[in-house]
Amino acid sequence: GSIEIRGSEGMVMSYAKCCHPIPGDPIVGHISTGRGMVIHTEDCNNIAEIIDDPEKCVSVRWDPDVKGEFSVELRVELENQRGIIATLATTITGCEANIERISTVERDARFSIVNLSLNVRNRVHLARVLKKVRLIRSVLKVTRVKSRKVRKTIKSILGAND
């Protein structure tokens, strides 16, 4: 397995979509009714309110020999230039990371934001990808996106129907 947990043998396990934990991240296990154990990063906003509840949270750590690929979200702010998306994609795949999803938002005629979902092996692999992407001349800023406020978004959508 990819996680070492005492007393969790046979428990269904999944990775939280809010914070996308990857090997190397400090993590915590949340025992969720119907979903088994959900692994979050320790700094995830969604875990903050329940982290002190021993009934729901368990101490977990990555198996040192973890294998596989893990999803991570990136936000890249860049200057619009011909071929910049191709350059970005080539740079990322050149680091042996796979792009699952990509979307762009044009801020204005000069700047765009590119949201990416990538597969990486661990934090070291992610750091290598980030370093290479930051070397692209048109790239202004690269950030790993974690802990989108999922609940607030849902509440605002539901509230909009009143």
Task: Locate predicted features.
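N-terminal non-catalytic structural scaffold regions of very large proteins
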Residues: 1-75, 81-85, 100-105, 123-124, ...
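A short, glycine/Asx- and small/polar-enriched loop/turn
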Residues: 70, 108-114
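Cytosolic transmitter module of two-component histidine kinases
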Residues: 79-95
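Short secondary-structure junctions
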Residues: 93-99, 135-139
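Short, low-order "capping/linker" segments at domain edges
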Residues: 114-121, 151-162
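Acidic, serine/threonine- and proline-rich low-complexity intrinsically disordered segments
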Residues: 141, 146-149
